[in-house]
Amino acid sequence: AHNVKHVPHSMGIGVNSHDMNRQQGMRIPMIHRLVLLCLLLILGGANSAAGKLNIVFILIDDMGWTDLGCYGSRYYETPNVDRLARQGMQFSDAYAASCVCSPTRASILTGKYPGRLHITHAIPIQGAERIKEPLPLLEAIYKKNLPLEEVTIAETLKDAGYVSASMGKWHVCWDREFYPEHQGFDLNVGGNNMGNPGNYFFPYNGKWRMTPKHPFTRWNTLPDGENGEYLTDRLTDEAVAFIEKNKDRPFFLYLSHYAVHTPLQAKKKIIAKYEEKPATEHHDNPTYAAMIESVDKSVGRVVKRLEKLGLTEKTVIIFTSDNGGHGKITSHYPLRGNKGNFYEGGIRVPLIVKWPGVVKPESKCKVPVISTDFYPTILAMAGLAQRPKQHVDGASIVPLLKQDENIRRDALYWHYPNYIGAGHPGGARPCSVIRRGDWKLIESFEDNRLELYNLKDDLGEQEDLASSMPEKTQELHRMLKQWRAEAKVQMPKRNPDYDPK
């Protein structure tokens, strides 16, 4: 065969015209089949991508339960979030997994309680060092980085073909090796190890130290920008650009605004509007109101871009907060407490879910849910298999969203073996909390005191029923202790140098 010469067909030697036409006749359908196969693969992939829901998760920092028009505020103006509530489901009893940021954020990303993760305080704060008085307990050591071994919701979605972006606050680590790009996100814009931006206007430089005894940590949230640029707007610019770029593939947008965390900084024009507006009984800070309005405009821009691109019907929007609002800045009335403690004002948060074609517009839900639930819920929304060994403390709230059944869960739990330290009114001291039905029990580790409240009758937690209802108190206390043992939480220890006198 290697010695055969090539002979031109014109010489009449070799394949005759009939044979050649026959072979070409066989060859053409083969080409057609290959082209058809390629088209089917391409279209199949496109249809598969087209069939997947996009997920937009908007997390606001330190937004209180009543900081929105749809949650009762007559001072703060939030027309875009209010519209979102009218188009979806609004939850009255939604909870953050902690009264401070890092633990709640870790719970959202992993589906696990902060106590189980051992991420129980705002990284890297050691609250006891901020308190000048002697303390009866040595606060528990907690992890300063979300372990890479945890399979985050971003990693699970990535395995399913999603492209994902973390925009804004991260704050579940101290070391760079644990930033969003190492936890499943394809894009990280402005996420680092700090809990606030230092500045809301470019340049976004910041410096912080835990106490005067500690050296300053300095950072720059976003090195590039233009003078006068406002961080909430910049993150929104990045978010809509991400949506535009990935409009033809399924995406997960984790839009985690630094607002409305301190420092209080907002656009002068919006501040001026609220300075002219009569304050209400509970809300009266013009700068904070202006920050909330900028967040609301951000939501409006994201929704508008989805509408413009024809993505509204295939995009879920989840809107919530990581804990209650700052007690020196906003009011949580009728709730007791604020960010930094475990009364309702510190942990009850706004939650709105818009899921076109599934969630009935203007629907309400009073069933207690918590931030560990987002992981399994998003998987269920996306039609993906649950990962119960990962999101062990979460429950899918899809049955609630569809209004076809309740979720099976005995209770919600919180664990905080630390001290908040200075800065927040009524700052938490080491404690654990359980809510079961309408009942809520708080156990304080310093003096073993138990507080019992019926939230249905006493939303403001003004009447402690522990002494008058010992059986209910002990029932919940037993459950709380059993959960702590199962979750293997870390506990504070007695301070051997403490003298109660």
Labelled PLM ranges:
Residues 11, 15-26, 49-53, 60, ...:
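Long, internal low-complexity/basic segments
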Residues 51-56, 87-92, 160-165, 184-186, ...:
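Loop/turn elements at helix/coil->beta-strand transitions in domains of secreted/extracellular proteins
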Residues 73-78, 95-100, 126, 140-151, ...:
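A short beta-strand-to-alpha-helix junction
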Residues 74-106, 111-116, 163-165, 186-192:
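Short, structured active-site-proximal loop/turn typified by the sulfatase FGly-forming signature C/S-X-P-X-R
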Residues 76, 176-184, 262-268, 304-358, ...:
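Histidine-centered active-site microenvironments of extracellular/periplasmic hydrolases
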Residues 121-163, 171-251, 257-259, 263-266, ...:
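Formylglycine-dependent
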Residues 186-187, 191-197, 325-330, 337-344, ...:
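C-terminal cap/loop subdomain of S1 sulfatases and analogous C-terminal strand-loop tails that border
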Residues 236-246, 272-314:
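A long, amphipathic alpha-helix that forms part
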